[in-house]
Amino acid sequence: MEFSMKFNATARSVQGSSASRRLRRAGRVPAIVYGGTAAPLNIELDHNEIYHALRKEEFHALILNMVIEGGKTEEVLLRSVQWHAYKPQVMHVDFQRVEANQALHTKVPLHFINAEVSPAVKLSGAIISHVLTELDITCLPALLPQFIEVNLGDLLGGGSIHLADIKLPKGVTFNAHGGDTNPLIAAAVVKGGGAADEGDAAAEQPAA
């Protein structure tokens, strides 16, 4: 992995709703780390630190270095975040431990490039629709990509990009859902194309 992020955590011994409310009033966030061979670990985080970290795409996709107060570091993956119903407040966070020899099942963001120079945009004035913005994948921790690139440079007006059209990084496999092994990734929608097609079809009908 070429890029990593770290965050600070403190082990907590007090649990329960009342304790969690006290933590939040003090600017802290209750969280838990689970998985691997160790027992689940209840931790607390600084709200401002985790709030700003969660605004970064890579914090949701990469293996993170969790630095526990006292010097111990563990590799973890963000699994879920609970937000306040109407305030910009992080209520609870779940992390999963990472074991080097155990495959990860996670989602990785897609980065779309070269749309502006594609024939679809330059020649046809198409609008690029991103049908998927992330992929559900499986890989070993050392092979987890920060993102997967989708090159739209050759896309034609009315054309599309499917999973089979992009190259997955080494050691990364796609997790198919519902039997769809080649999902639609992006499509070039030509403005007014549908209406024009219907008009052409009508013009081709023989007169009664």
Curated annotation (Swiss-Prot):
Instruction: Specify whether Ribonucleoprotein is a keyword of the entry.
Output: yes
Q: Is the keyword NAD in the record? A: no
Q: Which GO terms describe its molecular function?
A: 5S rRNA binding; structural constituent of ribosome
Pfam families, per this entry? Ribosomal_L25p, Ribosomal_TL5_C
Residues that span the membrane, as ranges: none
Q: Which GO terms describe its cellular component?
A: cytosolic large ribosomal subunit
Report the family membership.
Answer: Belongs to the bacterial ribosomal protein bL25 family. CTC subfamily.
The record's subunit annotation is: Part of the 50S ribosomal subunit; part of the 5S rRNA/L5/L18/L25 subcomplex. Contacts the 5S rRNA. Binds to the 5S rRNA independently of L5 and L18.
Its recorded name reads Large ribosomal subunit protein bL25
Q: Which organism is it from?
A: Bordetella pertussis (strain Tohama I / ATCC BAA-589 / NCTC 13251)
